[in-house]
Structures are given as C-alpha cells and as structure tokens.
Amino acid sequence: MTELLSLAGVHTHIGRYHILQGVDFSVAEGQTTMLLGRNGAGKTSTLRTIMGLWQASVGRISLDGQRIEHSATPDIARLGVGYVPESMAVFSDLTVKENLILAARDGPLDDVRLEWIFGFFPALKRFWLSRAGALSGGQKQMLSIARAIVEPRKLLLIDEPTKGLAPAIVVGLIECFAEIKRRGATILLVEQNFFAARELGDTVLVMDNGKIVHRGEMAALASDVALQERLLGLSLETHQ
C-alpha cells in the first residue's frame, strides 16, 4: 500500500512539558487507522502536531512525500488535510448552509459536491437553513465532519467524534464514517469508544505517555481482550 502520512522521531514540547516523545508511524492511503490510548496519552497532541497547530520540536512529518512539520495550519489544509477537532467545529450563529460555504475555501459549492455531502449526512439537507446552534449534538458533529470534507481531502484527522453522544447517534456516525471509508478516504481517527474503533479501524496505534507502544491490525486487538486490558485498561465488562 502507498504511504500517505508518516511521522519519524517526532517530539513536541509545550512550555516545559514534553508532550510527544519520539512518535513514529505511517498511515497507508485508503486505510482507516485508529489512534487509541488512555486519557493524556498524547493522541490529541499528535493530531494537533500533524495539523500544524503545535510545532514539532524535533522529527519529520511527511504528507504524500512532502515535508510539513514546519508548515502553517492553512498551508497543510490546502495540501488536502481535513481536521475535525474534539470540540465540534461549527459556527452556532450561522446556518448549516453558511457553515459549509465558509468551509469551501476553493470557491462556491456546486450541486454535485452538495449532493455528495448530503449522501453522507441527509439530515443536513433537511436543516439547510437552520442555525447550527439549534441542531442536536449528533447533527452538529455531522456538520463538523461535513465542513472537513466539503472539499476533496487526501487525509482526514478526526478527534473523538463520538464523545458524549447517545448510543443511537454513535451508530449513525459509524455508518457515515463507514461510507466515507468505502469511498476511498484515508482517515486517522482518535476514539475512546472501543466499539466504534473496532467497527471502523483497519489498523491501530496505541499511545502511552507520548509514545507509540503498540501497532497492528485492528481485528487482532479486537479479538484479544487481555491485550485490550493491558494497553487500554478495558475490562471484560466493557464488552458486555
């Protein structure tokens, strides 16, 4: 498989804190890679560093063969990277339509692109002229993701999209991500919900204390409860 994203020896410091400590991994084109770990392991920090929100102190980050560790966030976005932060990235006072128009940096939204988005998120078509602040939590998350894919993306970085959502909404989001994946998207996804991770992931990376401590196939981790407990602190009750 073609390597789309790679990190080699990446360290990130925020003030006196050594957040990422020699992170090495790659993401293959067309794959969904889950980035798992306990709270504070460095998962969100990894996404922020890739996206240029935090600067790597040491190391190399490459996107499709191009070095980006010193690039600004807008430049990384222009290279085709979409980012969905943990806090839903929507403008509450604007309509769904206005939110998507603002996200389309390369020009007006055409009907073909809109129908492509509505294919993932039909609810957004129903609430096209509604203020984003009036949407439910699940609908806001859908809008946040739609903003990230309103333009063609090489890579999607998504941070805990199911956090705080009701189980029924989580199932709906999993179906949306599965469709995005079927259409060939490359995704690096941070997720605490192991059910969602198991359903979506092709490969998995586990972080602890700013380092990658496990890498492998998601199916292998999903079938090994003892390994889940050791790496993630999951208990048997988690699976019942």
Name each region found by the language model:
Residues 36-38:
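The feature captures the beta-strand-to-loop junction immediately N-terminal to the Walker
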Residues 51:
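Helix-to-loop junction immediately C-terminal to a conserved catalytic motif
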Residues 55, 67-88, 114, 126-129, ...:
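ABC ATPase NBD coupling module
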Residues 131-135:
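Conserved ABC ATPase signature
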Residues 150-154:
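A short, proline-enriched helix->beta-strand linker immediately N-terminal to the Walker B motif
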Residues 156-160:
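Catalytic Walker B motif of ABC-type/P-loop ATPase nucleotide-binding domains
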